Curated annotation (Swiss-Prot):
Gene Ontology cellular component list: Cajal body; cytosol; nuclear speck; nucleus; U2-type precatalytic spliceosome; U4/U6 x U5 tri-snRNP complex
Annotated source species: Mus musculus
UniProt subunit comment: Component of the precatalytic spliceosome (spliceosome B complex). Component of the U4/U6-U5 tri-snRNP complex, a building block of the precatalytic spliceosome (spliceosome B complex). The U4/U6-U5 tri-snRNP complex is composed of the U4, U6 and U5 snRNAs and at least PRPF3, PRPF4, PRPF6, PRPF8, PRPF31, SNRNP200, TXNL4A, SNRNP40, SNRPB, SNRPD1, SNRPD2, SNRPD3, SNRPE, SNRPF, SNRPG, DDX23, CD2BP2, PPIH, SNU13, EFTUD2, SART1 and USP39, plus LSM2, LSM3, LSM4, LSM5, LSM6, LSM7 and LSM8. Interacts directly with PRPF4.
Annotated Pfam families: PRP3 (PF08572), Prp3_C (PF06544), PWI (PF01480)
Entry PTM: Ubiquitinated. Undergoes 'Lys-63'-linked polyubiquitination by PRPF19 and deubiquitination by USP4. 'Lys-63'-linked ubiquitination increases the affinity for PRPF8 and may regulate the assembly of the U4/U6-U5 tri-snRNP complex.
Gene this protein is translated from: Prpf3
CDD domains tied to this protein: Prp3_C
Role, per record: Plays a role in pre-mRNA splicing as component of the U4/U6-U5 tri-snRNP complex that is involved in spliceosome assembly, and as component of the precatalytic spliceosome (spliceosome B complex).
UniProt crosslink position (Glycyl lysine isopeptide (Lys-Gly) (interchain with G-Cter in SUMO2)): 139, 244, 252
UniProt-annotated stretches for the region Mediates interaction with SART3: 416-550
Name of the protein described by the UniProt record: U4/U6 small nuclear ribonucleoprotein Prp3
Entry's Gene Ontology molecular function annotations: identical protein binding
UniProt-listed InterPro entries: Pre-mRNA_splic_Prp3_dom, Prp3, Prp3_C, PWI_dom, PWI_dom_sf
Highest taxon above the source species: Eukaryota
């Protein structure tokens, strides 16, 4: 069912609000399309097909809400109209004109008597207070209305007290009472009292309702004209004459009354404050309206989203409007202080660079750093120790070498014999000679294969000759079909050809099955590949130590980590400024491949986004000296692995890096790499 233009206008704000809630922003195109669907009377399916290009997945939910709103609007309008009709009916029952006219026995219609005829004939005019509008009911008017209703009820009681009165009798005021008074009977006093009380109660309710309506209309200045008309119409309906307002009072403005001091006063002499209209800018008007709108948004109760099935409290709801950002002015002299701080920092760095350059030329810097790396010695160079370190293990503590005649017990365990310890084989060196494999040439491989096949064929022929195995079927092909079968091929060529092709397919199938039986499974291939990459390190672990100046590029880090994992190498990468140490442990073949990766395949001198920032801060001369490169510090063997899976460790200080290596028992790797870095920086 299509909707009228008025109904569509009432529905439009709700559709705009729903579209903004579904899409997150207002879209006039979707609103127009939805109004078009409702206006044409489409059903849910057609409306969903029409709106699907705009809303996608939210179409069905939006269409359901749209049709629910249409149904609610219809029901609300229906209930509103029914309530208006019932209210009018109730007022009509109390103050309306009588519709039922009693008839005489002859059937002649009598003239209808107005209900408040006596009131209409009265020329009395009720003056209203000057402060109230002529269309509004005053207290005196309401009192007059109550008195008129009481008189009308008294008159009706008099009419009902006669038997068959000539005048027409009105029907009972209450429509809810189905019983009618018979015309020819005398009304009882109890019934008359009941009728009077009901009429007075309804009149009181109607007066209260009218006063409440007038009070609400008074709050809306735009509707005061309509309110005046309604009030005047009600006064005429009740038989109360409205206050007469002269035409000159309506057309002419209110006279201005001034006192002796020139102030505006009313008729009673009280001072009146006039409203002064001052011109203002549009910007100020918009600002006031904006503040009022914000205040309304704050006062507006927020929708209860927690009752929604799809409400997620973790998701923050974005505000409908972006908060206005104010200007932030900088204090005077702020940037001058920043510039002065930067100049001071640059001068300090320049001074430090000059001192460092002078220290490099004199060698003070290098010797200082090497002294920090080298282990501390208890004795100075050239001093003779009192006891050698190898004797300290057998001499007891507190032994005094300065004593002239030491006791014999002090030499317990010392004899005049020389102890020769047992000879042990080195843990990693293997003196067994390595035999080189003998590889045949292609010609020798073919000859050996022919001999092997010939021997196997002779063995099969011997078994057939002795009757141990049945003779094999002749190997028939299409090319030797006539030569092998002869007469049979001539008699039934089709049958023979089918037989030959079946033999060929059988041989092909047997060949493929043999190949599949020899083929390794996926698990076996995986194990074979891992076995090929994993080398035997029972005789010793091969170790390589590399030093890289800059290892901040994530691509190069990934190459190191990925290749170490693929080659089943273990180790560690310690990241420190200008000294990045890479230690790898594994077999000799894997070390060979990893060495080629570090020294040849990776281009260390490539400029990256990370290294450019470091090089820009340094001078051109230092940038040339500190070109990124990788150096092999040391390679050798050890009995066991010192590290686990390849990992990266960030060490801001040298002590932290050395402690990390010391924890794994390999601090000498760090000392060696750092000393080479120090010596290289002095060159």
């Amino acid at each position: 069912m299509a909707l009228s233009k008025r109904e569509l206008d009432e529905l439009k704000p709700w559709i705009e609000k729903t579209v903004k809630r579904v899409l997150g922003f207002s879209e006039p195109t979707v609103v127009t399309a939805a109004l078009n669907c409702v206006g044409k009377g489409m059903d849910k399916k057609k409306a969903a097909d029409h709106l699907k290009p705009f809303l996608d997945d939210s179409t069905l939910r939006f269409v359901d809400k749209l049709f629910e709103a249409v149904e609610e609007g219809r029901s609300s309008r229906h209930s509103k109209s029914s309530s208006d009709r019932s209210r009018k009916r109730e007022l009509k029952e109390v103050f309306g004109d009588d519709s039922e006219i009693s008839k005489e026995s002859s059937g002649v219609k009598k003239r209808r008597i107005p209900r408040f005829e006596e009131v209409e004939e009265e020329p009395e005019v009720i003056p209203g207070p000057p402060s109230e509008s002529p269309g509004m009911l005053t207290k005196l008017q309401i009192k007059q209305m109550m008195e008129a209703a009481t008189r009308q009820i008294e008159e009706r009681k008099k009419q009902l007290s006669f038997i068959s009165p000539p005048a027409p009798q009105p029907k009972t005021p209450s429509s809810s009472q189905p019983e009618r008074l018979p015309i020819g009977n005398t009304i009882q006093p109890s019934q008359a009292a009941t009728f009077m009380n009901d009429a007075i109660e309804k009149a009181r309710k109607a007066a209260e309702l009218q006063a409440r309506i007038q009070a609400q209309l008074a709050l809306k200045p735009g509707l005061i004209g309509n309110a005046n008309m309604v009030g005047l119409a009600n006064l005429h309906a009740m038989g109360i004459a409205p206050p007469k307002v002269e035409l000159k009072d309506q057309t002419k403005p209110t006279p201005l009354i001034l006192d002796e001091q020139g102030r505006t006063v009313d008729a009673t002499g009280k001072e009146v404050e006039l409203t002064h209209r001052m011109p203002t800018l549009k910007a100020n008007i918009r600002a006031v309206k904006r503040e009022q709108f914000k205040q309304q948004l704050k006062e507006k109760p927020s929708e209860d989203m927690e009752s929604n099935t799809f409400f997620d409290p973790r998701v923050s709801i974005a505000p409908s409007q972006r908060q206005r950002r104010t200007f932030k002015f900088h204090d005077k002299g702020k940037f001058e202080k920043i510039a002065q701080r930067l100049r001071t920092k640059a001068q300090l760095e320049k001074l430090q660079a000059e001192i460092s350059q002078a220290a490099r030329k004199t060698g003070i810097h290098t010797s200082t750093r090497l002294a920090l790396i080298a282990p501390k010695k208890e004795l100075k160079e050239g001093d003779i120790p009192e006891i050698e370190w190898w004797d300290s293990y057998i001499i007891p503590n507190g032994f005094d070498l300065t004593e002239e005649n030491p006791k014999r017990e002090d030499y317990f365990g010392i004899t005049n014999l020389v102890e020769h310890p047992a000879q042990l084989n080195p843990p990693v060196d293997n003196d067994t000679p390595v035999t080189l494999g003998v590889y045949l040439t292609k010609k020798e491989q073919k000859k050996l294969r022919r001999q092997t096949r010939r021997e196997a064929q002779k063995e099969l022929q011997e078994k057939v000759r002795l009757g141990l195995t049945p003779p094999p079927e002749p190997k028939v092909r299409i090319s030797n079909l006539m030569r092998v079968l002869g007469t049979e091929a001539v008699q039934d060529p089709t049958k023979v050809e089918a037989h030959v092709r079946a033999q060929m397919a059988k041989r092909q199938k047997a060949h493929e099955e043999a190949n599949a039986a020899r083929k390794l499974t996926a698990e076996q291939r995986k194990v074979k590949k891992i076995k090929k990459l994993k080398e035997d390190i029972s005789q010793g672990v091969h170790i390589s130590v590399y030093r890289v100046r800059n290892l901040s590029n994530p691509a190069k880090k990934f190459k190191i980590e990925a290749n170490a994992g693929q080659l089943y190498l273990t180790g560690v990468v310690v990241l420190h400024k200008d000294v990045n140490v890479v230690v790898v442990e594994g077999g000799p073949k894997a070390q060979k491949k990893f060495k080629r990766l570090m020294l040849h395949r990776i281009k260390w001198d490539e400029q990256t986004s990370n290294t450019k920032g470091d090089d820009d801060e340094e001078s051109d001369e230092e940038a040339v000296k500190k070109t990124n490169k990788c150096v092999l510090v040391w390679e050798g063997t050890a009995k066991d692995r010192s590290f686990g899976e390849m990992k990266f460790k960030q060490c801001p200080t040298e002590n932290m890096a050395r402690e990390h290596f010391k924890k794994h028992g390999a601090e000498h790797y760090w000392d060696l790499a750092l000393s080479e870095s120090v010596l290289e920086s002095t060159d």
